[in-house]
Amino acid sequence: MDNVLARPADICCLKGSFHSGDATGSTIQIDGIDTYVAKPHPDKSNGNVLLFFPDAFGLHINSFLMMDAFAECGYLTLGVDYFLGDPVTKHSLTPLSDPNFDFESWKNKHLKASEDAAARWVKAVKAQYGSSEDVRFACVGYCWGARFVCQQLSADAPIFFSVPSTDKLFEPEQRSRTIEILTENNKQFNMQVFANVGHGFASRARLTDPYEKWAKEATFKSFVDWFDFWMEKK
């Protein structure tokens, strides 16, 4: 039986670039967990809530800018600090080349702890923001955060994957098996695969590379289109 098809976080989760820009959201606490809140303009709000599960760098500028962009598309976007103040960026801004950063130790500390924090946070978010019958929830996860989408998403809800063609954490055989399982169980899904980009491209692409920048932006647009379509259908 296939319990988990994607492999645990590895050194590839530390690759990529930091982006620049001005974050427009704010940070609050939900059940004692730091949460970045990006609010849509009232004229653009669709009344839906998007839960954002960040990569190993946690609540950092790349995540802030993406959450702000989702808010621009109408979604009240909430990002969780499931590392509880201890993301990779607390230890190093250059973790791949920093001899003082022990990734394996950091990973082992947070694999289970981040799951517990995420589950607690999601429960609190639903209690705080889901009191109205009109509120609908969607979720998006990058790198470290992708598994939380699978854990928190309803078994019957549509799911969208955007992945690189070469990824040691989600190899072609695993992608194919994922498609087989979803198809066998008559689940609604879509998967887009990008060549010549690395793990984490959707959140940490090199924006100086036109193709990587396009792949990142195409992924964002696909996510928004997917949310808009399925949230409208409910």
Curated annotation (Swiss-Prot):
Enzyme Commission identifier(s): 3.1.1.-
GO molecular function, one term: hydrolase activity
Catalytic residues in the record: C143, D167, H199
Keyword Hydrolase: yes
Pathway(s) served: Xenobiotic degradation
Highest taxon listed in the record's lineage: Eukaryota
Function recorded in the entry: Dienlactone hydrolase; part of the Fusarium detoxification of benzoxazolinone cluster 2 (FDB2) involved in the degradation of benzoxazolinones produced by the host plant. Maize, wheat, and rye produce the 2 benzoxazinone phytoanticipins 2,4-dihy-droxy-7-methoxy-1,4-benzoxazin-3-one (DIMBOA) and 2,4-dihydroxy-1,4-benzoxazin-3-one (DIBOA) that, due to their inherent instability once released, spontaneously degrade to the more stable corresponding benzoxazolinones, 6-methoxy-2-benzoxazolinone (MBOA) and 2-benzoxazolinone (BOA), respectively.
Family the UniProt entry places it in: Belongs to the dienelactone hydrolase family.
PANTHER family given in the database record: DIENELACTONE HYDROLASE, PROTEIN AIM2
Further facts: Fusarium verticillioides possesses 2 unlinked loci, FDB1 and FDB2, necessary for detoxification of antimicrobial compounds produced by maize, including 2-benzoxazolinone (BOA). The FDB2 cluster arose as a duplication of the FDB1 cluster with rearrangement and expansion by incorporating additional genes.
Protein's UniProt name: Dienlactone hydrolase 2
The organism of origin for this protein: Gibberella moniliformis (strain M3125 / FGSC 7600)
